[in-house]
Amino acid sequence: MEDIQQNNSMVEIRELNTDDYEELSLFNAQFPGDKRTKEDWLNRFQHWWDNNPAFDDKWIRGFLLIADGKIVGWVGSFPTWFKAGENIVKAFNGTSWRVLEPFRKYSIDLWTKNREISKHFISFNTTPTEDVIKMITRLGYVKYPWGGNRESYYLLKPYKYIQEILPQTWHRLLPLMGTFIILYQKAKIRLVKSNLTLKLLDINADEINELWNRNKNRIEFTNVRDSLAIQWYAENKLLLSVFLGEKLTAIAILDLRKNLKYDSFELTFVDCWVDYEISIMSVLSAIVRFCIKYAKENDVSRLRFPHFSPEYSNTLKKIGLLTKKYDHPGYIRIPDYLKKSFTNESSYFTLLQGDYGV
């Protein structure tokens, strides 16, 4: 515990523990600009720590900034299992560095506490502000490999999205333009046919483990995707299985959530793990086809497919989806003892990194 004097208030930094969940969830829900409820935050804490297969009692959840007995700031982290070469290690995923305005001068003191822990781990920061980016890049963080600065998408209800970029005087043309976009997408898209079948069902743990073990040695640096990890990542998301006959050949995680800006639901492609024997074109075509059908049946306005790698980028472009700019702010810091074996070509990152898709 570290005590600091501010005027007549005693400010301290201490470790976060389970007894703090209630007060911290309320602090987060009431923090300026936050859109989650107290219950949402309690569920996040349980997911990050209590239900996390990589978490144990040795892991420090984070640190609180306390003034006169009340939480005025905090910073957190949670672990995930990560494959680094031949080793399975814990990765450090930083989250939620936030401090109330009157106490901002202690922000660096608070962040430094987390930094002291994270320097021994592979460490991710996936939701940094511009100021945070300037700071973490000085500490050795770099953008992790990605498939360029575009993402593919498919609009099922284009009207709200068009409305945002058109002047008011053009809004009478929205129905016509929306119809044109829908027809244009249908004419442009090229989905290859295959014998793959897709299911939104619970998958047998042994099948997931077999898929992971068959393919894990193709990539040096990536998230562990055994059954425990996948089921944790997929909590409150859609877990999609891809079969060729009776054999599980791919799994994908999809995230359905409301986009408050457009007041519409969107389905985002969060992760995909594919058997090396199956073409990525066949798998992505099947997934896109499934997502379009699912969206029509569940009032989803837009499908989003981030480009996890150059291979995903090239394949999604060949499929013919529309694309737009997507500057994914994912940063990683590799400890010195692992740097020699880390290359862009040997790595595979998705939206499972940090707290972005978790």
Language-model-detected regions and their locations in the chain:
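A generic, well-ordered mixed alpha/beta core segment in the N-terminal half of proteins
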Residues: 111-115, 121-124
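Conserved N-terminal entry element of GNAT/NAT acetyltransferase domains
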Residues: 1-19, 177-204
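Active-site/acyl-donor-binding loops of N-acyltransferases
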Residues: 2-5, 121-186, 253-281, 285-358
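Conserved glycine-rich acetyl-CoA-binding loop
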Residues: 98-109, 275-285
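Short, hydrophobic/aromatic alpha-helical segments in well-folded domains
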Residues: 110-113, 229, 287-290
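A conserved beta-strand-loop-helix scaffold within acyl/acetyltransferase catalytic domains
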Residues: 13-92, 96-97, 199-274
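"Short basic amphipathic alpha-helical interaction patches in structured regions
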Residues: 88-92, 108-114
